[in-house]
Amino acid sequence: MPKIKTSRSASKRFKRLSSNKYKFKHAYARHILTKKSTKHKRHLRIKSILSKKNNRKIMKYLPYI
């Protein structure tokens, strides 16, 4: 049986933690930031952890990571 391919786009967006959870960076923090409030931009800087439901989906995309 052939090896499962790792989704390269998912591997660049998500990092696995030691507890088999995945952390990710928020969207909308690259450009056009002048309209956004300081509070909003500060919350976008914080890395978040995926929910359990999405965690199972990402595990299929990242079998070896």
UniProtKB/Swiss-Prot annotation:
- What is a single molecular function from GO for this protein? structural constituent of ribosome
Q: Which UniProt keywords apply?
A: Ribonucleoprotein, Ribosomal protein
> Mitochondrion among the record's keywords?
no
The record's Gene Ontology biological-process terms are:
translation
- The keyword rRNA-binding appears for this protein: no
The membrane-spanning stretches of this chain are: none
Superkingdom of source: Bacteria
Family annotation (PROSITE patterns): RIBOSOMAL_L35 (PS00936)
Its GO CC terms are:
cytosolic large ribosomal subunit
Q: Do you know which Pfam families this protein is assigned to?
A: Ribosomal_L35p
Q: Which residues form a coiled coil?
A: none
Q: PANTHER family, alphabetically?
A: 54S RIBOSOMAL PROTEIN BL35M (PTHR33343), LARGE RIBOSOMAL SUBUNIT PROTEIN BL35M (PTHR33343:SF1)
Family the entry assigns: Belongs to the bacterial ribosomal protein bL35 family.
State the name under which the record lists this protein: Large ribosomal subunit protein bL35
* GN (gene name): rpmI
